Amino acid sequence: MSDTTTAFTVPAVAKAVAAAIPDRELIIQGDRRYTYRQVIERSNRLAAYLHSQGLGCHTEREALAGHEVGQDLLGLYAYNGNEFVEALLGAFAARVAPFNVNFRYVKSELHYLLADSEATALIYHAAFAPRVAEILPELPRLRVLIQIADESGNELLDGAVDYEDALASVSAQPPPVRHCPDDLYVLYTGGTTGMPKGVLWRQHDIFMTSFGGRNLMTGEPSSSIDEIVQRAASGPGTKLMILPPLIHGAAQWSVMTAITTGQTVVFPTVVDHLDAEDVVRTIEREKVMVVTVVGDAMARPLVAAIEKGIADVSSLAVVANGGALLTPFVKQRLIEVLPNAVVVDGVGSSETGAQMHHMSTPGAVATGTFNAGPDTFVAAEDLSAILPPGHEGMGWLAQRGYVPLGYKGDAAKTAKTFPVIDGVRYAVPGDRARHHADGHIELLGRDSVCINSGGEKIFVEEVETAIASHPAVADVVVAGRPSERWGQEVVAVVALSDGAAVDAGELIAHASNSLARYKLPKAIVFRPVIERSPSGKADYRWAREQAVNG
């Protein structure tokens, strides 16, 4: 198991990196540009404000069980921008635990999340003020409201403070608290297959697995803050453009890794939806080298915008995908329009952090098989053992080493998802996998959306890949519906490209070129658009409803 002699906190690392490269730009969004020095100063002010409101750590970790929390929680209900990044850093500096709030949630979902988290503070864009106002009377613990001004024109809620006014009201000195590697980072799961759950991470553990605590080239754990600072200061300050919303874990990990490795984060100017033309023009203007996407839903519009030739994107060297399937068809299109770039697939989850990766280059495009990290394994079906490479059986993707403490407030689910195997604690969130003899791991899919038809397991990702490769298909999600004969049957919910015309029979025939007969959809349901989370992840609850209702 990987280890390091130094226990890290995010505030210590961020402060040290910023001191070494104070004038390097950290955040760029349109005309808004902030250096490392400015972001740290602003985040310190936010930390001071949170501390002035009595927020912080009230019970140290050693007195708590893995599913318990001793810190105040701050919800981040905002679009991408400097405020979100400052809020992450400021919360850590105040010993307040930040967590993500999905800005697509309707009233009942938002209420559930804020009640489950027991949040005492919320930072939100003014555009969301009406939604917050609806549920405030039912959330007596939520007492600190910080509103970010935007173009919505919505006025401050009663009892709320303007974000910039909050920063201006306090000193730029960080609060007098002693940071601890046990301080929490909280990440709520997407809730696309069940109710959202708050995953509790120690700062040291999430730093080592997903915030840049490992050398990006060798994978070796960092041994000291001095080593991290030297690496960040000697680097070129690569510009990284983040397309997924920061309410998505992988997007937060990209930002935090950028900070701890001395990179510059670029956000699109359009934040409430993906504007691919704005994206490619920003890539040209800022000479972006790396862009992050989430699956076909983001990559397809990006390819289309590049194909229009409206911007020079020759600076782009890497397209990094994570969080959703990027099919070989779309991956190949990306490589065709970006012949000098590589496409990197990353695998991870809220419960594991970053785990595996795969790189596709011209002439070598593949999906589904990954280079495993040093702490990534495949556990047996019954969780009794770890399967050796070359074992023919299908098991569970498992992660050891730097793993979360548990799920907030749920000891039973914590014990189930984080079992002890051969004396070692693992995170096993529910992905099916095989460990090949050459060391690569084949990711089969999430068990919770697997379809059991006639006794056969059918992974929806494989069917989605087959349907998505038809040129008329803009987007697809696959789900099961009850079948008297098979128990469950496969249904594909499809959105067609503008102007495209194709019938169900043609799509099924196309899929038969790469799928066994029993995996083929028994029906195709056409919809104008596929419902996804803001980050691009498929909403499988919605997909099942469409499959059942036709």
From Swiss-Prot:
Pathway: Lipid metabolism; fatty acid metabolism. It is an enzyme of class 6 (ligase). It is found in: Secreted, Cell wall. Induction: Expression is induced in human macrophages. Induced by acidity. Transcription seems to be maximal between day 1 and day 5 after phagocytosis. It comes from the Bacteria. Its EC number is 6.2.1.2. Transmembrane segments: none annotated. Keywords: ATP-binding, Cell wall, Fatty acid metabolism, Ligase, Lipid metabolism, Nucleotide-binding, Secreted, Signal. One of its GO terms (biological process) is fatty acid metabolic process. Inhibited by 2-hydroxydodecanoic acid, a typical inhibitor of medium-chain acyl-CoA synthetases. Its main location: secreted. GO terms for molecular function: ATP binding; medium-chain fatty acid-CoA ligase activity. Belongs to the ATP-dependent AMP-binding enzyme family. Catalyzes the activation of medium-chain fatty acids as acyl-coenzyme A (acyl-CoA). Shows maximal activity with saturated fatty acids of medium-chain length between C6 and C12. Has lower activity with tridecanoic acid (C13), tetradecanoic acid (C14) and with unsaturated fatty acids like oleic acid (C18:1), linolenic acid (C18:3) and arachidonic acid (C20:4). Shows weak activity with some aromatic carbon acids. Involved in the metabolism of fatty acid during mycobacterial survival in macrophages. This is Medium-chain acyl-CoA ligase Mig. It comes from Mycobacterium avium. The gene is mig.
